[in-house]
Structures are given as C-alpha cells and as structure tokens.
Curated annotation (Swiss-Prot):
Part of the ABC transporter complex PstSACB involved in phosphate import. Responsible for energy coupling to the transport system. It comes from Tropheryma whipplei (strain Twist). Gene3D superfamilies: P-loop containing nucleotide triphosphate hydrolases. One of its GO terms (biological process) is phosphate ion transmembrane transport. One of its GO terms (molecular function) is ATP hydrolysis activity. This is Phosphate import ATP-binding protein PstB. It holds the Pfam family ABC_tran.
Length: 257
C-alpha cells in the first residue's frame, strides 16, 4: 500500500493562534484513517488543511507541506484541489433549494463540466446507488434535498462529493448529528467507499474509529492553551490494543478527553 497524502512538518495558524504544530503523517491510499483526540487538539483544523479550506478563514495560514501524489497542494489551483479532495461536514448541508437530482450534480456544474443529460442521469443514479439512497428517493428526484431525513441528507452530500470522482474524501464528525440507525448506515458506507476512495475521518467516537478505520492518528494538547500535536499514528488494531504512548493509553481508556 502506498502513501497518497503526505503531511510534512505542518503547522497551522488562525491569526497569531497556533492550532497545530509540526504534524507529519502519511495517509495510505485506499484506506480509512481516523483522527481522534480531545476537543481543541486540532483534528478538524488538520482536516481543513488537506483540501485548503483552512485558508478561507480570516488570518489563517500554514507552514510545512501537504503532498498529494508528491505534488504540493499549496502550489496547485484550489478549485482543482477540492475536486481531488472532497469534504463531508459535521451537519448535513444539501443545497436546500436544489432538488435531489440537482444536489448530486452540483459539483459537475460548478466545475463547468459539460456532459449530456443522459450521462448526467446515469451519473446521478450511480452515485445515489453508491450511497444506498437510490431506492429511497428514485421516485422523488425533483423534490428539494432539504426534505430528506438527516441520515438521507448526509448520504446525499456524500453522493454529491463522489460525483466529481475525488481521490480523497474528508469527513468531519459525519455522524455526530445523526441517530444510531443513520450512523450505522454511514459507517457501512465508509467501509464500502474505501474501495474507490481514500478516507480521512475526524471522530470523537472511539468505538466508531475502531469499527471503520484501518489507521488511527491520536492528537493531544500538551498544555492548556497550547497547540495540538500528533501523539501516535499506527494501525487501528495496535492503537486500541497495544498503544506505545502513555497519552494514547490514557485517552482511549477514558482517563481524559
């Protein structure tokens, strides 16, 4: 298995505030990597640096490198980067006034890709089937995406993301606003999606991390008001059964966080 994303000595700032410090991490192609750790340790900040969303925040900047297949993301067109590296947010965010069909195809139209309507319909159906949503919505594709349940909306957002064929999908707490049944559906979907995509997921749910991920990276803040730092990165089974770092052991055993 080869590294698709390489994070090298990455430090991220919000104005004068240093959110994460000197993070180096390899993301394996075709795998699910979970980022875990207590609140405020920089997990979501790191995730946002991986498709250049971090720089959209006022005063935000990064030092270090993020390489996609050896190419520095910060030397590439950000529009291209976000085609290659999609993002799923904590709360489902379908475009509320767009139909289900329009939501799936939104990225295609945003990127001005011209494809025939027949091809559009084939792509839409393929993406909705990929997220196990087609059977639930095929007879109401013209209805607004905002009418769907929370779990359905999140799957619609994933269908929208994969429509542009990203190599990497970032997920920031994708199940935190969902009920247990919808959470199970998303977790099953994550395991299916890694056949075609590399996935990086931020989660506070350690059981979820152990269920869906192949690799786990543990983050922590060394002191109050300090920067988030990478503590340990290893195969998920190792992290949860025989961690090498005492901080990791204390976190997964519930002694803090």
């Amino acid at each position: 298995m080869t590294s698709l994303l390489e994070i090298k000595d990455l430090t991220a700032f919000y104005g004068p505030l240093r959110a994460i410090k000197d993070v180096s991490l390899s993301i394996q192609e075709g795998s699910v990597t979970a980022l875990i750790g207590p609140s405020g340790c920089g997990k979501s900040t790191l995730l946002r640096t991986l498709n250049r969303m971090h720089e959209l925040s006022p005063g935000a900047k990064v030092k270090g490198q993020v390489l996609l297949d050896g190419r520095d993301l910060y030397q590439l067109d950000p529009v291209y980067v976000r085609q290659e590296v999609g993002m799923i947010f904590q709360r489902p965010n379908p475009f509320p006034t767009m139909s289900i069909r329009e939501n799936v195809l939104a990225g295609i139209k945003l990127n001005r890709k011209r494809i025939h309507r027949i091809q559009q319909n084939e792509l839409m159906e393929r993406c909705l089937r990929s997220v196990n949503l087609w059977d639930e919505v095929h007879n109401r594709l013209g209805r607004p995406g905002g009418e769907l349940s929370g779990g359905q909306q999140q799957r619609l957002c994933i269908a929208r993301a994969i429509a542009v064929s990203p190599r990497v999908i970032l997920m920031d707490e994708p199940c935190s606003a969902l009920d247990p049944v919808s959470t199970k559906a998303i977790e099953q979907l994550i395991c299916k999606l890694k056949e075609k995509h590399t996935i990086v997921i931020v989660t506070h749910n350690m059981q979820q991390a152990s269920r869906v991920s192949d690799w786990t990276a543990v983050f922590n803040v060394a002191r109050s008001g300090g920067s988030g730092e990478l503590v340990e990165h290893d195969k998920t089974e190792v992290i949860f059964t025989s961690p090498k770092n005492e901080v990791t052991l204390n976190y997964i055993s519930g002694k803090f966080g």
